[in-house]
């Protein structure tokens, strides 16, 4: 459900400034220590990519500024955002963008995500899964590139307010497994403080992965 924001919106002046006078988005790359997470996934024999998608999506639900959008020229936020993510056709080397309904229950989301990837993995269409919802955000994966900087130039008649994530190739540094993730947000709805909140919660989820990964005991 989309909830409109009323005139009491505290960032009203900021929103209008970055939507009209200085229209801009900004990007940042964070390095995530996934050493503990990687070990648990290996032990449980879980696929890495669906877990990465779950982490990014769950953190999005936590921060309202990452769910803000404009619908029919009205500013507001989605109560829930579902992840849309890229997958590679290994034969044609083309990618598709599919989506999976978000579920905070890890086991349920994991099963749905794995099933979606398997179903559409051989498609050559850009959007093979029908009925993509309006309340979704984008994730891309570049597992071949260990990047330190990344930027998307989104050119549309209207400002794209929802966040965009790009996952890079993990590397080993001083015995730690480090995963680069690029985050792009629009300054009209998201300040550096809100981006910092998102990153802090994402790192918390990774550090406490053993708690929510216990749900995977019920994956069959």
Curated annotation (Swiss-Prot):
SUPFAM superfamilies assigned: CoA-dependent acyltransferases (SSF52777)
Give the enzyme's main class according to its UniProt record, as a single word. Answer: transferase
Report the transmembrane regions from the record: none
Which residues does the entry assign to the active site, renumbered to this chain?
187
**What Pfam families does the annotation carry?**
CAT (PF00302)
Any idea which UniProt keywords this protein has?
Acyltransferase, Antibiotic resistance, Transferase
Molecular function in Gene Ontology: chloramphenicol O-acetyltransferase activity
Q: Example GO biological process term?
A: response to antibiotic
What drives induction of this protein's expression?
A: By subinhibitory concentrations of chloramphenicol.
State whether keyword Cell division applies: no
**Reaction equation(s) it catalyzes:** chloramphenicol + acetyl-CoA = chloramphenicol 3-acetate + CoA
Q: What is its EC number?
A: 2.3.1.28
Entry-linked InterPro entries: CAT-like_dom_sf, Chloramphenicol_AcTrfase_AS, Cmp_AcTrfase
What family classification does the UniProt entry report for this protein?
Answer: Belongs to the chloramphenicol acetyltransferase family.
Under PANTHER family, the record lists: CHLORAMPHENICOL ACETYLTRANSFERASE (PTHR38474:SF2), SLR0299 PROTEIN (PTHR38474)
What does the UniProt function comment say about this protein? This enzyme is an effector of chloramphenicol resistance in bacteria.
Subunit-structure text:
Homotrimer.
Please report the name of this protein according to its UniProt entry. Answer: Chloramphenicol acetyltransferase
**Species:** Bacillus pumilus (Bacillus mesentericus)
GN (gene name): cat86
